Curated annotation (Swiss-Prot):
Residues 15-42, 75-94, 117-137, 679-705 are annotated as: Disordered. One of its GO terms (molecular function) is poly(A)-specific ribonuclease activity. It comes from Yarrowia lipolytica (strain CLIB 122 / E 150). Residues 21-30 have a biased composition (Gly residues). GO terms for cellular component: CCR4-NOT core complex; Cdc73/Paf1 complex; P-body. It catalyses: Exonucleolytic cleavage of poly(A) to 5'-AMP. Residues 81-94 have a biased composition (Basic and acidic residues). One of its GO terms (biological process) is positive regulation of transcription elongation by RNA polymerase II. Mg(2+) binds at residue 392. Residues 119-132, 695-705 have a biased composition (Polar residues). SUPFAM superfamilies: DNase I-like (SSF56219), L domain-like (SSF52058). Acts as a catalytic component of the CCR4-NOT core complex, which in the nucleus seems to be a general transcription factor, and in the cytoplasm the major mRNA deadenylase involved in mRNA turnover. Ccr4 has 3'-5' RNase activity with a strong preference for polyadenylated substrates and also low exonuclease activity towards single-stranded DNA. This is CCR4-Not complex 3'-5'-exoribonuclease subunit Ccr4. It comes from the Eukaryota.
Length: 705
């Protein structure tokens, strides 16, 4: 028998059980609840509103029972396994199973999916769902979540239905953040506390048949919510924050005096269109406070960039002064001294990755490239950094947007796409592949040399890298890259190696990220040694001999920027900061020859610029991931950090599901650090005096690559 038919028969049978035939159900008798609404003729033909009526009727019929969901689960479990836990013979009639509101909602979503597939691919036969395929996807998600948690939580559903509850204590929500399903239907609740925002793992929320007059705005923070049942309350409208529930499949509103525009939108397009309408029509959120500029007094401060407002102690022991920064505070500080410069690292979020499926909490107009590019450019101009390291820049935006816009501002740029761009047969497709870009101010730096790196090629050529199954299955099939620029500081003659990279994203491949960094640092070391040996080299900008010599490559100023997709407890962070990694958990069970047998190391003295303040709260802000994965590494023996751009206003993020948002155009935030050169000996054993080239001919010695 077709499962859809049997499912409908079960529903009809259950609805006609005693107490189920009354169209008013519990809605008419439960304390304070509305009676069901009788839809206008204009709604009767809507399949979406018919499903609302069907779901609401089942809610009224099954809801009055105390702990109705828990009882249904127990009944269904006994039918499946028997009272003694033994598997029951499927051929024997065990009686009807207990259908819940969630079961019916999941079934309607699956039916809609099948209809959509049939409509878009009519020529492809579509098989009906088998019993195995119809397993509740919410339960599958629950099992996956439980397996991934370090502290195993063996239950994730809470049923408090039919208890006559008049209020809920906020600690309930803060203590049960792991909940996936919460049933508080058929009570006497008049409000939901704002603390409900804590339940960010929630997939199902049933608040039907209460006395709610409104839903709290904080409900918009429940970004994992799939099913929201609010039948038979006193809701006349919905907060616009419901528009942030981009994964919502079903919202139940029948039995509420809901306003006509919401009712019509739900009847015409269903839940998805209603959520989209609320998202797109939401008012502009309040602008965040400006990011603060943090002055590292240990390095001598930033001449007059800002007045210190407060002092705190960083993890490294250095005292930092915090001051509110204007849009161009970094540039103001850098210009105060001839031996300082600023570096920005920014994953700008490639346009092709901005999908509704990934970022459905953001209005479409704010997700579009026009708005994001304008906001990105405004931010870059405001901070006026001397060196820019961008990740996730596709070829088209580099050529058509970034290069011409930044050229007008006095920058020259370099670009290297990910390796898959070379496999594209069409130039248009190749230009959609993202990569890394480096821009530098030609009045501050001139380009000596550039080097492009492909990690898969480096692994293939490296003799210490054993060609194992892990090598072929995990490393060689990744297309991540790095870009290196050797720059010379115009006023001091100091050379600096600027490196920009974007490592593999998947947390299941932390070993690959560590290998990629080891390969990168090995290449940078070889590059630096070659530059040091050739330190008598004089650029077109320094014909009068303002040239600095370096005893070895490790003495060269070095900055490595990027999206490393690695947290501070990762092997990547350890290798950078400690100079060596052996037996790290990220490499557990992997075989990469000497890289795993003897560990990995480098000879630089590297430090994260933001480690001077204990790192930021986050650099990547998405619904299911908020952490630090972007860094600006520098050679602490050759450079000093003078200042850092602070984090995002926490009051702003407390109301944001994730980035990008109207005000922040990427899911990453920009990092900005001000450095000063430590003194290096010149050819005569003394530091050379900085040259003043003025404004004339400021572009003559640079070349754009």
């Amino acid at each position: 028998m077709n499962h859809n038919t049997s499912f409908q028969q079960q529903l009809l049978q259950q609805l006609h059980q005693p107490g189920g035939s009354n169209p008013g159900g519990v809605g008419a008798t439960g304390a304070g609840n509305n009676s069901p609404s009788y839809p206008e003729a204009s709604l009767m033909g809507s399949k979406f509103w018919q499903k609302q009526m069907q779901l609401a009727q089942l809610s009224r019929q099954t809801g009055p029972t105390s702990h109705g969901y828990a009882r249904a689960a127990a009944i269904n479990s006994r039918q499946q396994h028997g009272r003694d836990g033994a598997q029951v013979d499927a051929d024997k009639d065990q009686g009807p199973s207990q259908l819940t509101l969630v079961d019916l909602a999941v079934q309607t979503v699956q039916q809609d999916l099948v209809e959509q597939q049939q409509a878009t691919a009519a020529s492809t036969p579509q098989r009906g769902y088998t019993n195995q395929q119809k397993k509740d996807q919410l339960e599958e998600e629950r099992q996956m979540t439980l397996m991934q948690q370090e502290k195993h939580q063996y239950w994730a559903d809470l049923d408090m239905s039919g208890q006559g509850l008049m209020c809920l204590s906020p600690p309930l929500f803060r203590s049960y953040e792991f909940l996936l399903k919460l049933y508080i239907n058929h009570n006497k609740l008049t409000t939901l506390p704002p603390a409900i925002r804590s339940l960010r793992q929630l997939r199902v929320l049933d608040v039907s048949s209460n006395m709610l007059t409104k839903l709290p705005p904080e409900i918009g923070m429940l970004h994992n919510l799939r099913y929201l049942f609010a039948f038979d309350n006193y809701l006349s409208t919905l907060p616009h924050q419901v528009g942030q529930l981009y994964q919502l499949e079903v919202i139940g509103l029948e039995g509420n005096p809901i306003n006509q525009p919401i009712k019509e939108k739900l009847a015409q397009g269903g839940t998805k269109e209603l959520v989209a309408e609320l998202r797109e029509s939401a008012p502009m959120p309040a602008a965040p406070k400006p990011r603060e500029w943090i002055v590292l007094e240990e390095a001598g401060g930033r001449g007059g960039a800002a007045t210190a407002a407060a002092a705190t102690e960083g993890e490294s022991g250095s005292t930092v002064a915090t001051a509110t920064a204007g849009a161009n505070a970094a540039a103001a500080g850098a210009s105060a001294s001839s031996d300082t410069f600023t570096v920005m690292s920014y994953n700008t979020l490639c346009d092709k990755y901005t999908t509704v499926q990934m970022h459905g909490y953001t209005p479409l107009w704010a997700l579009g490239w026009k708005h994001r590019s304008e906001t990105l450019l405004k931010e870059v101009i405001g901070y006026d950094s001397d060196i820019l390291c961008f990740q996730e820049v596709d070829g088209a935006s580099f050529e058509d947007f970034w290069s011409p816009k930044l050229h007008q501002l006095g920058y020259a740029g370099l670009y290297h796409p990910k390796t898959r761009a070379r496999t594209m047969s069409k130039e248009k497709d190749a230009k959609r592949v993202d990569g890394c870009a480096i821009f530098y101010k030609t009045k501050s730096f001139c380009l000596i040399e550039k080097l492009s790196l492909d990690f898969s090629s480096l692994a293939l050529k490296n003799n210490d890298f054993k060609k194992t199954a892990d090598t072929y299955n995990r490393v060689l099939n990744k297309d991540n890259i790095a870009l290196i620029a050797l720059l010379e500081h115009v006023t001091t003659g100091q050379k600096i190696i600027v490196t920009n990279t974007h490592l593999h994203w998947d947390p299941a491949f932390n070993d690959v990220k560590l290998i990629q960094v080891a390969l990168l640092l090995d290449e940078v070391e070889k590059f630096a040694e070659r530059v040091a040996k050739d330190s008598n080299r004089v650029s077109a900008r320094n014909q009068d001999g303002n040239n600095v010599k370096y005893e070895s490559g490790k003495k060269l100023p070095l900055v490595i920027c990027g999206d490393f997709n690695s947290t501070t407890d990762s092997g990547v962070y350890s290798l950078f900061s400690q100079g060596t990694v052996t037996n790290h958990k990220d490499m557990s069970g992997r075989a990469y020859g000497k890289f795993t047998d003897e560990g990995m190391n480098h000879g630089f003295t590297l430090k994260s610029a933001y480690s001077n303040i204990g790192e930021l709260a986050f650099t990547n802000y998405t619904p299911n991931f908020v952490d630090v994965i972007d860094y600006v590494w520098y050679s602490s023996n050759a450079l000093s950090v003078r200042g850092l751009l602070g984090g995002i206003d926490p009051d702003y993020t407390s109301n944001m599901v994730g980035f990008p948002s109207v005000h922040y155009p990427s899911d990453h935030i920009s990092l900005l650090a001000e450095f000063s050169f430590k003194k290096q000996k010149g050819g005569d054993g003394q530091p050379k005096k900085a040259l003043d080239f003025g404004n004339s001919g400021s572009h003559s010695g640079s070349r754009k690559t």
